Amino acid sequence: MSSGAGSDATGAGGVHAAGSGDRAVAAAVERAKATAARNIPAFDDLPVPADTANLREGADLNNALLALLPLVGVWRGEGEGRGPDGDYRFGQQIVVSHDGGDYLNWESRSWRLTATGDYQEPGLREAGFWRFVADPYDPSESQAIELLLAHSAGYVELFYGRPRTQSSWELVTDALARSRSGVLVGGAKRLYGIVEGGDLAYVEERVDADGGLVPHLSARLSRFVG
């Protein structure tokens, strides 16, 4: 399965092609014409700050989360998965929001697609929180990412990781707990990155029955909000 999560818009040696910076800025401005005015629904009668997936609206992003700022938004697109019944394609929406607190809200849902790209059935779903914490393996380091997820398939997963660059992040499962009705899964490794065109791309590998990491999910999602 292809990824793209580790790529960027630079050429060989990290040098931008002539004019590519101007084109990237122009493309970003054009995209923002559609996405900048959108946000996620919110109840306006609650006494707490509303969740926002648009950095132009709502509470200011907590300073502790600045290294995760590019993730905030609503992302939609398609990807490829590998399951017990073989490879498949899926559609996906990821909502990354905040309320000014020291964490990001994360909600991802996907749906399987037919060979012609039509909706087939519900897919994977997860919800949780991103935050920065003291590195559990190095108390003097404060740039460890903690991602806590609850999966609709019946398990809870704790990831730790680090920023790889200003726009890419790598995480690995540290702990996993399964409910009595939950599916049996192994730990995972995830890589997220903002790639050329401003899209969010990621790859996930999971430990199989033989104890090795194997490709599980990959997708490239375009910004819909923010």
Swiss-Prot record:
It comes from the Bacteria. Pfam families: THAP4_heme-bd (PF08768). Its cofactor is heme b. Heme b binds at K189, H216. InterPro entries: Calycin (IPR012674), Nb(III)_bact/plant (IPR022939), Nitrobindin (IPR045165), THAP4-like_heme-bd (IPR014878). GO terms for cellular component: plasma membrane. The keyword Heme applies. The modification N-acetylserine is found at S2. It is an enzyme of class 5 (isomerase). It catalyses: peroxynitrite = nitrate. Its EC number is 5.99.-.-. Forms a 10-stranded antiparallel beta-barrel structure able to accommodate a hydrophobic ligand in its interior. In fact, this fold hosts the heme group, which is located in a wide surface cleft. HAMAP family: nitrobindin. Was identified as a high-confidence drug target. Heme-binding protein able to scavenge peroxynitrite and to protect free L-tyrosine against peroxynitrite-mediated nitration, by acting as a peroxynitrite isomerase that converts peroxynitrite to nitrate. Therefore, this protein likely plays a role in peroxynitrite sensing and in the detoxification of reactive nitrogen and oxygen species (RNS and ROS, respectively). Is able to bind nitric oxide (NO) in vitro, but may act as a sensor of peroxynitrite levels in vivo. Homodimer. This is Peroxynitrite isomerase 2. It comes from Mycobacterium tuberculosis (strain ATCC 25618 / H37Rv).
